[in-house]
């Protein structure tokens, strides 16, 4: 018989640096899950990734207080800032203060967007790379990035 699921916890944790401090500790503690067990398992799975890269994770909590977790690909904003040469250590999604008003903070090419689309394809809600690139173009413009090519 399958275990009964009691809930899901969605977090965005820097790769290789999960620790019991907020936001991880309180989120898992509310569900009665072993915080250190998650931190060790997460850090082991993300050891090969760039340290500090924001990794979305979905934790499934079961009635017997066990859990499983699934790693997603980093947010689009992280890849766009990296492609444009911006500081990726700032909070996720930060770009231009006034996007679309003429002030751009960087430039990305369609080739870079296609490369990002290939990486993000499994997490995006689209069928082909061309539509994924269009979604990424919109995200880039809303961040204040200029799309070239």
Curated annotation (Swiss-Prot):
It comes from the Bacteria. CDD domains: Ribosomal_L11 (cd00349). GO terms for molecular function: large ribosomal subunit rRNA binding; structural constituent of ribosome. The keyword Ribonucleoprotein applies. One or more lysine residues are methylated. One of its GO terms (biological process) is translation. Pfam families: Ribosomal_L11 (PF00298), Ribosomal_L11_N (PF03946). The keyword Ribonucleoprotein applies. GO terms for cellular component: cytosolic large ribosomal subunit. Keywords: Methylation, Ribonucleoprotein, Ribosomal protein, RNA-binding, rRNA-binding. Belongs to the universal ribosomal protein uL11 family. Forms part of the ribosomal stalk which helps the ribosome interact with GTP-bound translation factors. PANTHER family: 60S RIBOSOMAL PROTEIN L12, LARGE RIBOSOMAL SUBUNIT PROTEIN UL11M. Part of the ribosomal stalk of the 50S ribosomal subunit. Interacts with L10 and the large rRNA to form the base of the stalk. L10 forms an elongated spine to which L12 dimers bind in a sequential fashion forming a multimeric L10(L12)X complex. This is Large ribosomal subunit protein uL11. It comes from Azorhizobium caulinodans (strain ATCC 43989 / DSM 5975 / JCM 20966 / LMG 6465 / NBRC 14845 / NCIMB 13405 / ORS 571).
């Amino acid at each position: 018989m399958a275990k009964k699921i009691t809930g899901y916890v969605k977090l965005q944790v820097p790769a290789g640096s999960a620790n019991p401090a907020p936001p991880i500790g309180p989120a898992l503690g509310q569900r009665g899950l072993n915080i250190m067990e998650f931190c060790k398992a997460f850090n082991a799975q993300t050891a090969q990734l760039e340290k500090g890269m924001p990794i979305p994770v979905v934790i499934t909590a079961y009635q017997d207080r066990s859990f499983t977790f699934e790693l997603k690909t980093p947010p689009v904003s992280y890849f766009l800032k990296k492609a444009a040469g911006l500081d990726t250590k700032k909070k996720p999604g930060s770009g231009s203060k006034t996007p679309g008003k003429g002030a751009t903070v960087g430039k990305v090419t369609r080739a870079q967007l296609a490369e990002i689309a290939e990486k993000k394809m499994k997490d995006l809600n689209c069928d082909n790379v061309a539509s994924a690139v269009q979604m990424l173009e919109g995200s880039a413009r809303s961040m204040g990035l200029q799309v070239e090519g």
